[in-house]
Curated annotation (Swiss-Prot):
Residues binding ATP, per UniProt: 65-72
InterPro entries referenced in this protein's UniProt entry, alphabetically: Formate_THF_ligase, Formate_THF_ligase_CS, P-loop_NTPase
Disulfide bonds: none
Source organism (scientific name): Syntrophus aciditrophicus (strain SB)
One MF annotation (Gene Ontology) recorded for this entry: formate-tetrahydrofolate ligase activity
Protein name per the record: Formate--tetrahydrofolate ligase
Keyword Nucleotide-binding: yes
One Pfam family this sequence matches: FTHFS
Gene Ontology biological-process annotations: tetrahydrofolate interconversion
Catalytic activity: (6S)-5,6,7,8-tetrahydrofolate + formate + ATP = (6R)-10-formyltetrahydrofolate + ADP + phosphate
Keywords, in A-Z order: ATP-binding, Ligase, Nucleotide-binding, One-carbon metabolism
């Protein structure tokens, strides 16, 4: 029995064993989760380790509108276009979080004729990786509080416990809570809160680990709090790294699915880019690089967030070598950054589209700082006019930018052929080897300022008192050699979501700096960024339903826009 794509009847899904066979994986190399998705065994990954790397294509974007610019859709469509040109290609993407799926942006599996399948399964639980991360994280939380409750032999100061709890849902009411109420039998009262699962350090660690040994070692190094005399307390001090790792046994294995055009896709891990590193697992990406000639991966939000972190954190840790950046832009986003109200973005306005290119230009120039080539993917929406598309293409080409319009949502791989050909052309003339923006052994303040000034355009940094105290502890205990993973709004190049276009002469405010010693980076938290989102007035949950036959509706993202872009 064949399975028809519930969203588009033009393609049939193939059994996952058939998809695996196209990239050299046998049925013994995978563990099937139903008929159309599977985990890839670690033994299979080891078997292909000696193969040469494929060309790694990183998809990023200009500063997005609140609805996103279709970066996941473009990533999938580009992979399909490369496959149409006869290139062995795999898409390596992140898993959706339930928070955005039920929140403002909806599903995260692409759109139109450029999706990953099975859509509903991937958006809702998938292979339970997020549930495993949530359980592992909260086990450590429970063990920390249990240690304080029972004799507190580690001398943990409850006021200085830094390890919060997580939930894979948008819920502003859990950001700040008090636990341990109801008398001594119910624990030691203290203030804490919940973050969303994609911001969990366990998620970051999972996406930066290649083996159970490495995973367990990183978990052992997690900082959970401080003692009464300000000495750090690590997860290893609690002797619980083995139990936490055990919960992640299957979550470490990459997931294999397929696109609308039956191109293999490895979907694994899901850290957000505004509050974490924002890319899929290095294990999944490395596997894809061994099994294909071209790998298309994405980094969340604009280039200032996910892509910067990819170059400065993920690629060095993973030994990855991105050779080209595909920078997604839309006429809608260009008009938005020219000051056009969201309600008027569907009205034709070529002049505004060109005026908004200041934001796009900044991202394009930033890419050059990492010594990699770039092509702009002008992702077409149904509301775009030919006049607008042509005006943007002319303006970009007049400035010497590489640009290719694409209609990937409507046409699938066919709509991305020009983009694929331009990408291959640039790859043919590109040498390997990118350059990091800063060295990890620089002072923490220098690393933060380098990113803020070079990538965002800030003129200085304002450290709040808590951040200053954090810096003292970071330097005292030797965490200062870690890279910085700056948490910042995705809606602006600055830390103020209201500053659109190309902000100038602004100061970035650092409220605090969290230590993610297990994952191996520091998290300066800027502006008003939150690690637990809230639901909008009209969340996507209101549009999701299931009928008597079990058919789910409303999960696919509106307009095909990824909730992770």
């Amino acid at each position: 029995m064949t399975h028809r794509n519930s969203r588009q009847d033009t393609k049939e899904l193939k059994p996952i064993a058939d998809i695996a066979a196209t990239i050299g994986l046998s049925e013994d190399d995978i563990e099937a989760y139903g008929r159309y998705k599977a985990k890839v065994r670690l033994e299979a990954i080891s078997r292909f380790h000696s193969r040469p790397d494929a060309s790694l294509i990183l998809v990023s974007a200009m500063t997005p509108t609140p609805a996103g610019e279709g970066k996941t859709t473009v990533s999938i469509g580009l992979a399909q276009a490369l496959a149409r040109l006869g290139k062995a290609t795999i898409a390596a993407l992140r898993e959706p979080s339930l928070g955005p799926v039920f929140g403002m942006k909806g599903g995260a599996t692409g759109g139109g004729l450029s999706r990953v399948h099975p859509v509903d399964d991937i958006n809702l639980h998938f292979t339970n990786d997020f549930a495993a991360v949530e359980s592992a994280h909260n086990l450590l939380s429970a063990i920390v509080d249990n240690s304080v409750y029972h004799d507190n032999i580690l001398n943990i100061d409850p006021r200085k416990v830094t390890w919060r709890r997580v939930l894979d849902m948008n819920d502003r009411f859990l950001r700040n809570i008090v636990i341990g109420l109801g008398g001594s039998v119910n624990g030691v009262p203290r203030e804490t809160g919940f973050d969303i699962v994609p911001s969990s350090e366990i998620m970051a660690i999972l996406c930066l680990s290649r083996s159970y040994r490495e995973l367990k070692e990183k978990i052992r190094r997690i900082l959970v709090g401080f003692t009464y005399d300000d000495s750090p307390v690590m997860a290893g001090d609690l002797k619980v790294e083995g139990a936490v790792t055990a919960l992640l046994k299957y979550a470490l294995l990459p997931n294999l699915v397929q696109t609308t055009e039956n191109v293999p896709a490895i979907i694994h891990g899901g850290p957000f880019a505004n509050i974490a590193q924002g890319t899929s697992s290095i294990l999944g990406t490395d596997l894809a690089l061994r099994l294909a000639d071209y790998v298309v991966t994405e980094a969340g939000f604009g280039f200032d967030l996910g892509a910067e972190k990819f170059f400065d954190i993920v690629a060095p840790y993973g030994g990855l070598n991105p050779r080209i950046v595909v920078l997604v832009a839309t006429v809608r986003a260009l008009k938005y950054h020219a000051g056009i109200a969201q309600a008027d973005l569907d009205r034709s306005n070529p002049r505004a589209a060109v005026l908004g290119m200041a934001n796009l230009r900044k991202h394009y120039q930033n890419i050059d700082k990492f010594h990699v080539s770039c092509v702009i993917a002008l992702n077409r929406f149904s509301s775009d006019t030919d006049e607008e598309i042509n005006a943007v293409v002319r303006a970009a080409e007049n400035e010497g930018m590489n640009i290719a319009p694409c209609d990937i949502f409507r046409l699938g791989g066919e709509g991305g052929l020009e983009l694929a050909e331009k990408t291959l052309e640039l790859l043919a003339g590109t040498s390997c080897g990118y350059r990091r923006l800063y060295e990890w052994n620089q002072p923490v303040e220098d690393k933060i300022f380098t990113v803020a000034s070079e990538i965002y355009g800030a003129v200085s940094i304002d450290y709040q008192p808590l951040a200053r105290r954090n810096l003292d502890l970071i330097n005292k205990y030797g965490f200062d050699k870690l890279p910085v993973c700056i948490a910042k709004t995705q809606q602006s190049l600055s830390d103020n979501p209201g500053l659109l276009g190309l902000p100038r002469d602004f100061i970035v405010t650092v409220r605090e700096i969290r230590i993610a010693s297990g994952a191996g980076f520091l998290i300066p938290i800027t502006g008003e960024i939150l690690r637990m989102p809230g639901l909008s007035k009209r969340p996507a949950a209101y549009s999701i339903d299931i009928d008597d036959s079990g058919n789910i509706t409303g999960v696919g993202s509106p307009g095909g826009i990824s909730s992770l872009s």
